[in-house]
Protein backbone atom coordinates (compact mmCIF):
# COMPACT_ATOMS: atom_id res chain seq x y z
CA UNK A 1 0.00 0.00 0.00
CA UNK A 2 1.46 3.40 -0.92
CA UNK A 3 2.46 5.73 1.91
CA UNK A 4 0.14 8.73 1.97
CA UNK A 5 1.68 12.16 1.72
CA UNK A 6 4.72 11.25 -0.39
CA UNK A 7 5.35 12.32 -3.97
CA UNK A 8 5.33 8.69 -5.13
CA UNK A 9 1.96 7.90 -3.58
CA UNK A 10 0.39 11.02 -5.08
CA UNK A 11 1.59 10.12 -8.55
CA UNK A 12 0.38 6.53 -8.20
CA UNK A 13 -3.05 7.83 -7.22
CA UNK A 14 -3.08 10.06 -10.31
CA UNK A 15 -3.72 13.12 -8.15
CA UNK A 16 -2.42 16.53 -9.07
CA UNK A 17 -2.06 19.29 -6.51
CA UNK A 18 -3.42 19.08 -2.98
CA UNK A 19 -5.79 16.36 -1.85
CA UNK A 20 -9.03 17.95 -0.66
CA UNK A 21 -9.12 18.03 3.15
CA UNK A 22 -5.50 16.86 3.52
CA UNK A 23 -2.58 19.10 4.50
CA UNK A 24 1.00 18.04 3.89
CA UNK A 25 2.84 17.68 7.20
CA UNK A 26 5.91 19.89 7.62
CA UNK A 27 8.39 20.40 10.44
CA UNK A 28 7.75 23.48 12.58
CA UNK A 29 10.08 26.34 11.79
CA UNK A 30 12.60 27.21 14.46
CA UNK A 31 12.00 30.63 15.95
CA UNK A 32 14.90 32.89 15.00
CA UNK A 33 16.87 34.15 18.01
CA UNK A 34 16.33 37.82 18.72
CA UNK A 35 19.25 40.27 18.84
CA UNK A 36 20.25 41.88 22.13
CA UNK A 37 18.12 44.89 22.97
CA UNK A 38 20.12 48.06 23.45
CA UNK A 39 18.58 51.19 24.95
CA UNK A 40 20.73 54.24 24.13
CA UNK A 41 22.32 56.21 26.93
CA UNK A 42 20.07 59.13 27.78
CA UNK A 43 20.11 62.24 29.94
CA UNK A 44 18.41 60.37 32.77
CA UNK A 45 21.35 57.92 32.82
CA UNK A 46 23.78 60.80 33.22
CA UNK A 47 21.70 62.24 36.06
CA UNK A 48 21.51 58.85 37.81
CA UNK A 49 25.26 58.35 37.41
CA UNK A 50 26.01 61.84 38.73
CA UNK A 51 23.82 61.33 41.82
CA UNK A 52 25.38 57.98 42.67
CA UNK A 53 28.93 59.19 42.01
CA UNK A 54 28.31 62.28 44.14
CA UNK A 55 26.98 60.22 47.05
CA UNK A 56 29.87 57.78 46.74
CA UNK A 57 32.42 60.59 46.76
CA UNK A 58 30.79 62.29 49.75
CA UNK A 59 30.53 59.15 51.87
CA UNK A 60 34.11 58.14 51.14
CA UNK A 61 35.74 61.53 51.70
CA UNK A 62 34.04 62.14 55.06
CA UNK A 63 36.64 61.58 57.78
CA UNK A 64 39.15 60.22 55.27
CA UNK A 65 42.23 61.33 57.20
CA UNK A 66 41.04 59.84 60.50
CA UNK A 67 41.81 57.76 62.43
CA UNK A 68 45.55 57.21 62.60
CA UNK A 69 47.92 55.71 65.12
CA UNK A 70 49.49 58.97 66.22
CA UNK A 71 49.79 60.14 62.62
CA UNK A 72 50.96 56.78 61.33
CA UNK A 73 49.05 54.07 59.42
CA UNK A 74 46.68 51.65 61.14
CA UNK A 75 45.86 47.97 60.65
CA UNK A 76 47.31 46.52 57.41
CA UNK A 77 48.11 50.00 56.17
CA UNK A 78 51.29 49.44 58.16
CA UNK A 79 52.43 46.99 55.46
CA UNK A 80 51.42 48.72 52.25
CA UNK A 81 51.80 52.42 53.02
CA UNK A 82 55.55 52.18 53.85
CA UNK A 83 56.08 49.99 50.78
CA UNK A 84 54.39 52.61 48.61
CA UNK A 85 56.51 55.33 50.22
CA UNK A 86 59.61 53.30 49.35
CA UNK A 87 58.46 53.47 45.74
CA UNK A 88 58.13 57.24 45.97
CA UNK A 89 61.60 57.65 47.48
CA UNK A 90 63.23 55.30 44.96
CA UNK A 91 61.36 56.84 42.03
CA UNK A 92 63.60 57.19 38.98
CA UNK A 93 61.33 57.86 36.02
CA UNK A 94 57.57 57.76 35.34
CA UNK A 95 57.78 54.57 33.29
CA UNK A 96 59.66 52.40 35.76
CA UNK A 97 58.57 53.90 39.07
CA UNK A 98 60.17 52.82 42.33
CA UNK A 99 60.72 49.58 44.22
CA UNK A 100 59.70 48.19 47.60
CA UNK A 101 62.79 48.02 49.77
CA UNK A 102 61.28 48.05 53.25
CA UNK A 103 62.18 44.72 54.92
CA UNK A 104 60.55 45.51 58.26
CA UNK A 105 57.60 43.20 57.71
CA UNK A 106 59.43 40.38 55.95
CA UNK A 107 58.86 39.26 52.40
CA UNK A 108 56.70 41.53 50.24
CA UNK A 109 53.96 39.05 49.38
CA UNK A 110 51.77 40.92 46.88
CA UNK A 111 52.50 42.14 43.34
CA UNK A 112 53.53 45.78 42.89
CA UNK A 113 50.54 47.48 41.22
CA UNK A 114 48.49 48.17 44.36
CA UNK A 115 51.49 49.81 46.03
CA UNK A 116 52.26 51.74 42.84
CA UNK A 117 48.76 53.21 42.93
CA UNK A 118 49.09 54.11 46.61
CA UNK A 119 52.40 55.75 45.75
CA UNK A 120 50.65 58.17 43.38
CA UNK A 121 48.70 59.65 46.29
CA UNK A 122 51.78 59.77 48.49
CA UNK A 123 53.76 61.46 45.72
CA UNK A 124 51.06 64.14 45.45
CA UNK A 125 50.27 64.69 49.14
CA UNK A 126 53.26 63.26 50.97
CA UNK A 127 53.51 60.64 53.67
CA UNK A 128 50.24 61.77 55.24
CA UNK A 129 46.84 60.16 55.84
CA UNK A 130 45.48 62.05 52.83
CA UNK A 131 48.42 60.89 50.74
CA UNK A 132 47.99 57.21 51.47
CA UNK A 133 44.15 57.20 51.43
CA UNK A 134 43.15 59.45 48.54
CA UNK A 135 43.73 56.85 45.81
CA UNK A 136 41.71 54.12 47.59
CA UNK A 137 38.87 56.63 48.06
CA UNK A 138 38.83 57.55 44.36
CA UNK A 139 38.98 53.92 43.29
CA UNK A 140 36.19 53.21 45.77
CA UNK A 141 34.03 55.80 44.02
CA UNK A 142 34.94 54.19 40.71
CA UNK A 143 33.86 50.81 42.04
CA UNK A 144 30.40 52.16 42.85
CA UNK A 145 30.17 53.79 39.42
CA UNK A 146 31.07 50.56 37.63
CA UNK A 147 28.55 48.68 39.74
CA UNK A 148 25.89 51.01 38.36
CA UNK A 149 27.26 50.70 34.82
CA UNK A 150 27.38 46.91 35.01
CA UNK A 151 23.75 46.67 36.12
CA UNK A 152 22.72 49.24 33.49
CA UNK A 153 24.43 47.19 30.78
CA UNK A 154 22.95 43.89 31.92
CA UNK A 155 19.39 45.14 32.38
CA UNK A 156 19.29 48.06 29.92
CA UNK A 157 17.44 49.88 32.68
CA UNK A 158 18.37 53.27 34.09
CA UNK A 159 16.29 52.64 37.21
CA UNK A 160 17.88 49.29 38.04
CA UNK A 161 21.36 50.64 37.40
CA UNK A 162 20.58 53.48 39.79
CA UNK A 163 19.31 51.01 42.40
CA UNK A 164 22.49 48.91 42.14
CA UNK A 165 24.64 52.00 42.50
CA UNK A 166 22.61 53.26 45.45
CA UNK A 167 22.92 49.93 47.26
CA UNK A 168 26.68 49.95 46.61
CA UNK A 169 27.01 53.48 48.04
CA UNK A 170 25.52 52.36 51.35
CA UNK A 171 27.30 49.03 51.72
CA UNK A 172 29.67 49.08 54.66
CA UNK A 173 32.19 46.72 53.08
CA UNK A 174 32.66 48.86 49.98
CA UNK A 175 32.80 51.99 52.12
CA UNK A 176 35.46 50.88 54.61
CA UNK A 177 37.51 49.18 51.89
CA UNK A 178 37.75 52.56 50.15
CA UNK A 179 38.83 54.53 53.23
CA UNK A 180 42.16 52.92 54.06
CA UNK A 181 45.52 52.58 52.34
CA UNK A 182 45.22 48.90 51.50
CA UNK A 183 45.13 46.89 48.28
CA UNK A 184 41.69 45.32 48.09
CA UNK A 185 39.87 48.38 46.77
CA UNK A 186 42.08 48.47 43.67
CA UNK A 187 41.45 44.84 42.86
CA UNK A 188 37.70 45.19 43.44
CA UNK A 189 37.64 48.14 41.03
CA UNK A 190 39.45 46.24 38.28
CA UNK A 191 37.27 43.15 38.77
CA UNK A 192 33.92 44.94 38.55
CA UNK A 193 35.21 46.95 35.57
CA UNK A 194 36.26 43.66 33.94
CA UNK A 195 32.77 42.27 34.53
CA UNK A 196 31.37 45.35 32.79
CA UNK A 197 33.60 44.90 29.74
CA UNK A 198 32.89 41.16 29.68
CA UNK A 199 29.15 41.89 29.63
CA UNK A 200 29.84 44.26 26.74
CA UNK A 201 31.71 41.54 24.86
CA UNK A 202 28.88 39.06 25.39
CA UNK A 203 26.37 41.53 23.98
CA UNK A 204 28.62 42.38 21.05
CA UNK A 205 29.25 38.70 20.23
CA UNK A 206 25.49 38.12 20.32
CA UNK A 207 24.86 41.02 17.95
CA UNK A 208 27.60 39.92 15.54
CA UNK A 209 26.33 36.36 15.50
CA UNK A 210 22.80 37.57 14.86
CA UNK A 211 23.83 39.60 11.81
CA UNK A 212 26.31 37.05 10.44
CA UNK A 213 25.58 34.56 7.68
CA UNK A 214 25.61 31.08 9.21
CA UNK A 215 27.59 29.07 6.67
CA UNK A 216 29.76 25.99 6.90
CA UNK A 217 29.93 23.53 9.75
CA UNK A 218 31.67 25.82 12.22
CA UNK A 219 29.76 29.06 11.84
CA UNK A 220 31.11 32.58 11.27
CA UNK A 221 34.23 34.25 12.56
CA UNK A 222 33.26 37.12 14.83
CA UNK A 223 36.30 39.31 14.25
CA UNK A 224 38.46 41.07 16.79
CA UNK A 225 36.54 41.69 20.01
CA UNK A 226 37.70 44.85 21.67
CA UNK A 227 35.50 44.41 24.74
CA UNK A 228 37.09 41.02 25.39
CA UNK A 229 40.55 42.50 24.95
CA UNK A 230 39.65 45.23 27.47
CA UNK A 231 38.49 42.51 29.85
CA UNK A 232 41.91 40.90 29.58
CA UNK A 233 43.61 44.21 30.34
CA UNK A 234 41.51 44.75 33.45
CA UNK A 235 42.01 41.18 34.64
CA UNK A 236 45.74 41.63 34.20
CA UNK A 237 45.56 44.72 36.40
CA UNK A 238 43.53 42.81 39.01
CA UNK A 239 46.15 40.05 39.00
CA UNK A 240 48.89 42.66 39.38
CA UNK A 241 47.30 43.78 42.65
CA UNK A 242 46.73 40.35 44.21
CA UNK A 243 47.12 36.79 42.97
CA UNK A 244 43.45 36.08 43.62
CA UNK A 245 42.89 37.80 40.28
CA UNK A 246 43.77 34.39 38.81
CA UNK A 247 40.36 33.09 39.89
CA UNK A 248 38.59 35.73 37.82
CA UNK A 249 40.76 35.01 34.80
CA UNK A 250 39.72 31.36 34.99
CA UNK A 251 36.02 31.94 35.63
CA UNK A 252 35.60 34.79 33.15
CA UNK A 253 37.53 32.86 30.52
CA UNK A 254 35.27 29.83 30.90
CA UNK A 255 32.18 32.03 30.82
CA UNK A 256 33.35 33.67 27.60
CA UNK A 257 33.96 30.29 25.93
CA UNK A 258 30.64 28.79 27.03
CA UNK A 259 28.77 31.92 25.96
CA UNK A 260 30.27 31.60 22.49
CA UNK A 261 29.33 27.92 22.43
CA UNK A 262 25.76 28.76 23.45
CA UNK A 263 25.52 31.38 20.70
CA UNK A 264 26.76 28.99 18.02
CA UNK A 265 24.36 26.32 19.18
CA UNK A 266 21.49 28.81 19.43
CA UNK A 267 22.02 30.05 15.89
CA UNK A 268 22.04 26.59 14.40
CA UNK A 269 25.74 26.05 13.69
CA UNK A 270 26.18 22.44 12.59
CA UNK A 271 29.21 21.75 14.79
CA UNK A 272 29.11 24.35 17.55
CA UNK A 273 31.70 22.72 19.82
CA UNK A 274 34.32 22.45 17.10
CA UNK A 275 33.41 25.90 15.86
CA UNK A 276 33.94 27.36 19.32
CA UNK A 277 37.24 25.53 19.79
CA UNK A 278 38.57 26.67 16.42
CA UNK A 279 37.11 30.15 16.03
CA UNK A 280 36.58 31.50 19.53
CA UNK A 281 38.88 29.83 22.05
CA UNK A 282 42.28 30.77 20.52
CA UNK A 283 41.38 34.47 20.45
CA UNK A 284 39.88 34.19 23.94
CA UNK A 285 43.10 32.66 25.25
CA UNK A 286 45.09 35.50 23.72
CA UNK A 287 42.87 38.19 25.24
CA UNK A 288 42.02 36.60 28.59
CA UNK A 289 45.23 34.70 29.39
CA UNK A 290 48.15 36.08 27.39
CA UNK A 291 47.26 39.76 27.83
CA UNK A 292 46.86 39.47 31.64
CA UNK A 293 50.13 37.53 31.86
CA UNK A 294 52.03 40.19 29.91
CA UNK A 295 50.54 42.99 31.99
CA UNK A 296 51.42 41.14 35.18
CA UNK A 297 55.04 40.83 34.08
CA UNK A 298 55.06 44.50 33.10
CA UNK A 299 53.93 45.47 36.60
CA UNK A 300 57.30 44.13 37.82
CA UNK A 301 59.29 46.42 35.52
CA UNK A 302 60.85 48.39 38.40
CA UNK A 303 61.93 45.15 40.07
CA UNK A 304 63.68 43.98 36.91
CA UNK A 305 65.33 47.38 36.35
CA UNK A 306 66.67 47.69 39.90
CA UNK A 307 69.86 46.16 41.21
CA UNK A 308 68.73 46.24 44.85
CA UNK A 309 65.18 44.88 44.76
CA UNK A 310 64.38 41.85 46.90
CA UNK A 311 65.87 38.60 45.51
CA UNK A 312 66.87 40.44 42.32
CA UNK A 313 70.09 38.41 42.05
CA UNK A 314 69.07 35.29 43.94
CA UNK A 315 70.54 33.16 41.16
CA UNK A 316 74.07 34.56 41.36
CA UNK A 317 74.35 35.23 45.09
CA UNK A 318 73.81 31.58 46.05
CA UNK A 319 70.30 31.98 47.43
CA UNK A 320 68.73 29.67 44.86
CA UNK A 321 71.40 26.97 45.06
CA UNK A 322 70.65 26.49 48.75
CA UNK A 323 66.88 26.52 48.34
CA UNK A 324 64.25 23.89 47.62
CA UNK A 325 64.34 24.88 43.95
CA UNK A 326 67.99 24.61 42.85
CA UNK A 327 66.88 23.75 39.31
CA UNK A 328 66.02 27.42 38.84
CA UNK A 329 69.74 28.10 38.61
CA UNK A 330 69.74 26.77 35.05
CA UNK A 331 67.66 29.75 33.93
CA UNK A 332 68.90 33.28 33.18
CA UNK A 333 69.56 35.29 36.34
CA UNK A 334 66.61 37.69 36.02
CA UNK A 335 64.12 34.94 35.18
CA UNK A 336 65.43 32.56 37.84
CA UNK A 337 65.41 35.24 40.54
CA UNK A 338 61.90 36.39 39.60
CA UNK A 339 60.55 32.83 39.69
CA UNK A 340 62.34 32.17 42.99
CA UNK A 341 60.65 35.25 44.44
CA UNK A 342 57.26 33.94 43.31
CA UNK A 343 57.85 30.45 44.66
CA UNK A 344 58.90 31.96 48.00
CA UNK A 345 55.70 34.01 48.12
CA UNK A 346 53.61 30.95 47.20
CA UNK A 347 55.33 28.99 49.96
CA UNK A 348 54.52 31.78 52.43
CA UNK A 349 50.84 31.81 51.49
CA UNK A 350 50.65 28.01 51.69
CA UNK A 351 52.05 28.08 55.23
CA UNK A 352 49.28 30.33 56.60
CA UNK A 353 47.03 27.49 57.72
CA UNK A 354 45.15 26.83 60.91
CA UNK A 355 46.47 23.27 61.05
CA UNK A 356 50.06 24.55 61.13
CA UNK A 357 49.32 26.65 64.20
CA UNK A 358 48.52 30.01 62.64
CA UNK A 359 45.53 31.76 64.16
CA UNK A 360 44.01 35.21 64.28
CA UNK A 361 41.16 36.51 66.46
CA UNK A 362 39.35 37.90 63.39
CA UNK A 363 39.80 34.89 61.14
CA UNK A 364 36.71 34.42 58.95
CA UNK A 365 35.79 31.48 56.73
CA UNK A 366 33.91 31.79 53.41
CA UNK A 367 30.58 30.52 54.70
CA UNK A 368 30.61 33.33 57.28
CA UNK A 369 31.04 35.88 54.49
CA UNK A 370 27.63 34.98 53.08
CA UNK A 371 25.90 36.79 55.94
CA UNK A 372 28.72 39.04 57.12
CA UNK A 373 28.86 37.00 60.30
CA UNK A 374 32.46 37.81 61.16
CA UNK A 375 33.56 41.37 60.38
CA UNK A 376 37.13 42.44 61.01
CA UNK A 377 38.31 45.12 63.40
CA UNK A 378 40.39 47.87 61.76
CA UNK A 379 40.66 50.35 64.62
CA UNK A 380 39.84 50.44 68.32
CA UNK A 381 40.07 53.10 71.01
CA UNK A 382 38.24 52.21 74.23
CA UNK A 383 37.75 53.55 77.75
CA UNK A 384 37.51 57.14 76.54
CA UNK A 385 36.17 59.47 79.22
CA UNK A 386 33.15 61.34 77.83
CA UNK A 387 31.53 62.81 80.92
CA UNK A 388 28.81 60.70 82.46
CA UNK A 389 30.07 57.45 80.92
CA UNK A 390 32.88 55.90 78.92
CA UNK A 391 33.01 55.97 75.14
CA UNK A 392 34.85 54.23 72.37
CA UNK A 393 35.83 54.66 68.73
CA UNK A 394 35.70 51.51 66.62
CA UNK A 395 35.96 50.78 62.90
CA UNK A 396 34.98 47.42 61.46
CA UNK A 397 34.90 46.12 57.94
CA UNK A 398 31.21 45.48 58.27
CA UNK A 399 28.56 44.64 55.70
CA UNK A 400 25.23 46.46 55.89
CA UNK A 401 22.84 43.71 57.12
CA UNK A 402 20.02 44.75 54.76
CA UNK A 403 22.41 43.84 51.94
CA UNK A 404 24.53 40.97 53.19
CA UNK A 405 21.76 39.06 54.95
CA UNK A 406 20.04 38.74 51.58
CA UNK A 407 23.11 37.25 49.88
CA UNK A 408 22.06 33.60 50.08
CA UNK A 409 18.40 34.24 49.10
CA UNK A 410 19.37 36.40 46.13
CA UNK A 411 21.97 33.88 44.95
CA UNK A 412 19.43 31.05 45.06
CA UNK A 413 16.80 33.20 43.36
CA UNK A 414 19.27 34.25 40.64
CA UNK A 415 20.21 30.65 39.92
CA UNK A 416 16.50 29.79 39.72
CA UNK A 417 15.62 32.55 37.23
CA UNK A 418 18.65 31.63 35.14
CA UNK A 419 17.71 27.96 34.95
CA UNK A 420 13.93 28.26 34.73
CA UNK A 421 13.34 31.58 32.99
CA UNK A 422 16.58 31.75 31.01
CA UNK A 423 17.22 35.21 32.43
CA UNK A 424 20.77 35.69 31.20
CA UNK A 425 21.11 39.04 32.99
CA UNK A 426 22.20 37.25 36.15
CA UNK A 427 24.95 35.17 34.53
CA UNK A 428 27.84 37.64 34.80
CA UNK A 429 27.27 38.64 38.46
CA UNK A 430 26.65 35.01 39.44
CA UNK A 431 29.86 33.78 37.81
CA UNK A 432 31.80 36.74 39.20
CA UNK A 433 30.51 35.96 42.68
CA UNK A 434 31.51 32.31 42.24
CA UNK A 435 35.01 33.37 41.17
CA UNK A 436 35.46 35.29 44.41
CA UNK A 437 33.92 32.64 46.65
CA UNK A 438 34.26 29.05 45.42
CA UNK A 439 38.10 28.87 45.25
CA UNK A 440 38.37 29.87 48.90
CA UNK A 441 36.24 26.89 49.89
CA UNK A 442 38.98 24.62 48.60
CA UNK A 443 41.50 26.42 50.83
CA UNK A 444 39.35 26.54 53.96
CA UNK A 445 42.28 25.57 56.22
CA UNK A 446 44.06 28.79 55.28
CA UNK A 447 43.78 31.91 57.39
CA UNK A 448 41.13 34.12 55.80
CA UNK A 449 39.52 37.43 56.60
CA UNK A 450 36.34 39.23 55.66
CA UNK A 451 38.19 41.70 53.42
CA UNK A 452 38.73 38.76 51.03
CA UNK A 453 34.98 39.07 50.37
CA UNK A 454 35.16 42.71 49.29
CA UNK A 455 35.04 41.73 45.61
CA UNK A 456 31.74 39.92 46.21
CA UNK A 457 29.93 43.10 47.24
CA UNK A 458 29.38 44.75 43.82
CA UNK A 459 27.86 41.58 42.41
CA UNK A 460 25.55 41.17 45.40
CA UNK A 461 24.38 44.74 44.74
CA UNK A 462 23.73 43.99 41.05
CA UNK A 463 21.80 40.79 41.79
CA UNK A 464 19.73 42.60 44.41
CA UNK A 465 18.90 45.31 41.87
CA UNK A 466 17.78 42.72 39.31
CA UNK A 467 15.62 41.07 41.97
CA UNK A 468 14.20 44.48 42.84
CA UNK A 469 13.14 44.80 39.20
CA UNK A 470 11.07 41.64 39.51
CA UNK A 471 9.52 42.76 42.79
CA UNK A 472 8.59 46.17 41.37
CA UNK A 473 6.37 44.50 38.76
CA UNK A 474 4.38 42.58 41.36
CA UNK A 475 1.24 43.53 43.25
CA UNK A 476 -1.64 45.90 42.70
CA UNK A 477 -2.01 49.66 42.92
CA UNK A 478 -1.70 51.05 46.43
CA UNK A 479 -5.18 52.40 47.30
CA UNK A 480 -3.86 55.38 49.26
CA UNK A 481 -4.39 58.76 47.61
CA UNK A 482 -1.53 60.43 49.45
CA UNK A 483 0.91 57.83 48.10
CA UNK A 484 -0.22 58.49 44.53
CA UNK A 485 -0.12 62.23 45.09
CA UNK A 486 3.37 62.07 46.56
CA UNK A 487 4.70 59.90 43.74
CA UNK A 488 2.81 61.65 40.96
CA UNK A 489 1.66 58.35 39.47
CA UNK A 490 -0.07 55.15 40.63
CA UNK A 491 2.29 53.13 42.82
CA UNK A 492 2.01 49.35 43.06
CA UNK A 493 2.61 47.37 46.21
CA UNK A 494 5.72 45.93 44.57
CA UNK A 495 7.15 49.39 43.93
CA UNK A 496 6.31 50.40 47.48
CA UNK A 497 8.17 47.33 48.77
CA UNK A 498 11.23 48.39 46.77
CA UNK A 499 11.09 51.89 48.25
CA UNK A 500 10.81 50.46 51.75
CA UNK A 501 13.78 48.16 51.11
CA UNK A 502 16.00 50.97 49.84
CA UNK A 503 15.00 53.09 52.83
CA UNK A 504 15.99 50.17 55.06
CA UNK A 505 19.42 49.97 53.40
CA UNK A 506 20.03 53.68 53.94
CA UNK A 507 18.63 53.55 57.48
CA UNK A 508 20.86 50.65 58.47
CA UNK A 509 23.88 52.40 56.98
CA UNK A 510 23.18 55.43 59.18
CA UNK A 511 22.48 53.23 62.22
CA UNK A 512 25.81 51.41 61.88
CA UNK A 513 27.77 54.49 60.73
CA UNK A 514 29.63 54.81 64.08
CA UNK A 515 31.49 51.54 63.47
CA UNK A 516 32.11 52.41 59.81
CA UNK A 517 33.54 55.89 60.43
CA UNK A 518 34.99 55.52 63.93
CA UNK A 519 32.52 57.98 65.44
CA UNK A 520 32.86 58.29 69.21
CA UNK A 521 29.88 56.64 70.89
CA UNK A 522 28.97 55.64 74.45
CA UNK A 523 29.62 52.04 75.35
CA UNK A 524 25.91 51.38 75.79
CA UNK A 525 25.21 52.43 72.17
CA UNK A 526 28.02 50.18 70.99
CA UNK A 527 26.33 47.30 72.81
CA UNK A 528 23.05 48.16 71.06
CA UNK A 529 24.45 48.00 67.54
CA UNK A 530 26.57 44.87 67.99
CA UNK A 531 23.67 42.49 67.51
CA UNK A 532 25.57 39.23 67.13
CA UNK A 533 28.26 37.78 69.42
CA UNK A 534 30.37 37.00 66.34
CA UNK A 535 30.53 40.71 65.51
CA UNK A 536 32.48 41.50 68.68
Per-segment meaning from a language model:
Residues 3-6, 14-19, 23-26, 219-227, ...:
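Transmembrane helical bundles and short interhelical boundary loops of multi-pass, membrane-embedded
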Residues 134-155, 193, 410:
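Transmembrane-helix motifs of polytopic, lipid-linked glycan transferases
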Residues 41-77, 289-307, 504-512:
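Transmembrane signal-anchor helices characteristic of membrane glycosylation enzymes that use polyprenol
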Residues 13-16, 34, 154-155, 194-227, ...:
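Membrane-interface transmembrane helices that cradle and orient dolichyl/undecaprenyl
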Residues 48-53, 147-170, 207-222, 427:
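Transmembrane-helix signature of polytopic, membrane-embedded enzymes
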Residues 136, 173-186, 241-244:
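Short acidic/glycine- and proline-prone juxtamembrane loop motifs at membrane-interface regions
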Residues 56-59, 164-169, 176, 235, ...:
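Short helix- or helix-capping micro-motifs
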Residues 61-67, 77-116, 120:
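Extracytosolic helix-loop segments that constitute the early lumenal/periplasmic catalytic or substrate-binding loops
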Amino acid sequence: MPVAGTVDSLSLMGTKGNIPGVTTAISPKRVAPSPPVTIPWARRDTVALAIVAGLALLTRLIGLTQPTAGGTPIFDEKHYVPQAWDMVRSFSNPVLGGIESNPAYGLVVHPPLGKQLLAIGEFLFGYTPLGWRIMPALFGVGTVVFTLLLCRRLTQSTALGFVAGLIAVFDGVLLVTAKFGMLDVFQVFFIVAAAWTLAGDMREAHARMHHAHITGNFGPRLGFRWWRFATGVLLGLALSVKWSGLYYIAFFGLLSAFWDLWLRRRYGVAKPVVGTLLRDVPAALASLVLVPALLYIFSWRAWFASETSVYRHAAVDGTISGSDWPWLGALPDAVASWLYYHLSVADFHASLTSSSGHSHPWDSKPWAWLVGARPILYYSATDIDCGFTTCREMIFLFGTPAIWWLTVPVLLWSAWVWLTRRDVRVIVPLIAFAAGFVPWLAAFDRQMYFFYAAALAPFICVLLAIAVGYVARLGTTVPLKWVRKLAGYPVTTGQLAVIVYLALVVGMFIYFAPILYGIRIPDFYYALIMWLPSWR
